Each structure stands twice: as C-alpha cells, then as structure tokens.
Amino acid sequence: MQKRKEAVKTRIKDIYDDSKQNYGAPKIAKELQKSGEVIAERTVGKYMKEMGIRAQWVKPWTATTKDSDFSNELHNILDERFNPDRPNAVWCSDITYIWTTEGFVYLTSIMDLFSRKIIAWTLSKTMEVSCVIDTINKAKARRKIDLPLIIHSDRGRQYVSSEYRKATAKMQLSYSKKAFPWDNACIESFHSLLKREWINRFKIRDFKQAYNLVFEYIEAFYNTKRIHSYCGYISPNDFELLYEKVNKGELQLAG
C-alpha cells in the first residue's frame, strides 16, 4: 500500500512539474485517471498537501484596450455564443499588456473558439494597427482558409481601423457591446491565465525575455499540453486532432 502511494506521489510530482507547477488536484487527478490510475481528486489533494505542493499562480495586473468606437454600426454577431461546432467558424482577438523593466510590450492573440487554441500571436513594442494585421495574416496562413468566418474583438481603435477591415474583408466582423468586456471573455480569460500561471512569476528584463516566455507558454504548454475542461480535459491541439479523426470517420464517438 505504501509503495503504491509513493509511486502515485511520484506521478503527481511529474505531472505537476510538467504543467509548470500550474495544475492543482482536479487536473492532476484527471491526468492520472487518463493513464489508468483509479484515484479520487480528494486523494490527490491530500497527497499534494503532504508533499507541500500546490498550484502556483500570481494575480494578474489587468488592463485592456479602450473602446474607441461607440457607434451603432458595430454589431455583436457572436452574442456570447462561445461554442462553435467546428474549427475556423469563430475566431476572437484581443491585445494585452506585459510589463518589463524596459517598459510595456503588447501581445496580440487570436483564438479559435472551437478548441480555445491560440492560432496566432504577435508580441510588439507598440500597439500599432500593423501588429493586429500581422497577427491576422499569420492566422490566415496557418489555418489555410479563405472562408467567411466570424472574427470577434472589442472596439479598440486597432479593430475598427480601415486597415483591419481590409485585412478581414472576407470575414464577418463582430464586436463586443458597449462597455461589455465579457463579450470577449474567452480570449481575455486566456490572457489572464497566461499572466496568472506564468508571466507574473518573473521580473521580465526586456522584450526578448518576454517573447521567450510567451512562446514557451503558448507553443510548448498551452496549445500542446495544458488540459482544458471545455475540451474534455485534453489540450486544444488534441481536441482539434480528435475532431479531424471523427470527421474523417477514423473513430466513432460514444453516445
């Protein structure tokens, strides 16, 4: 019995470290169960307490783009429908600030709402419209699509500019309602998560370090490893792969 307990504790520590020390008992229990371990979340929590480990996070400093267009011409097509049934049906985008000792840098991200995957991102030293356009172009190239899809954002000046409208000419533009930031909750939640789980652990020196940290979190953890409750406790990448397999008839979903 003691041997099994120690073996489970070793697995808990491995999963904990692999998650960049972000996973608490619920997610660690899910990972153990996926590998065939029969264990309750409460037991995992008990073992973690005995081991002196817990999910690490730092409260994020919050700031967002300011709405610059309050006209009635911008419509909320998405209307908080955050669960599309396929990839490339709805993208959402937002800009967030990251503090460094040399000053703020700015992260523009685009998320595919189907899988919550970050499909494109750009870190820059300014908040120019060109940074958003670069991110849009990356997303279009990576997803290899030229279809009319919905792209949702807030009403910041970058997202209501003529350059943005040109870059998204074949897409349906959707905007958060006036003073309703939660209309873009999924991407804003991701930015908060990035800071809480990773960025705010560090005193970031400069742009290069900020870029490396963002790259490590998004490309080496969030998209590829971090399990997401919305995705049935698998990573965004795995969720999209599962969709492809089901769509090709390679496997059948139970139910």
Q: What are these model-predicted stretches?
A:
Residues 99, 103, 121-144, 160:
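Active-site beta-loop-alpha junctions of metal-dependent nucleic acid enzymes
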Residues 48, 127, 175-177:
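Methionine-biased hydrophobic packing positions in alpha-helices, especially
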Residues 64-68, 153-155, 161-165, 175-195, ...:
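RNase H-like two-metal-ion nuclease catalytic core shared by retroviral integrases
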Residues 80, 84-119, 125-126:
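An active-site-proximal beta-strand-loop segment
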Residues 1-86, 180, 235-244:
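Basic, flexible linker segments flanking DNA-binding modules
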Residues 169-171, 193-255:
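C-terminal domain-tail junction helix/linker
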Residues 1, 38, 82-83, 100-101, ...:
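Conserved, non-catalytic sequence blocks in retroelement Pol enzymes and Pol-derived host proteins
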Residues 12, 28, 44, 48, ...:
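Mobile genetic element proteins and their domesticated derivatives, centered on retroelements
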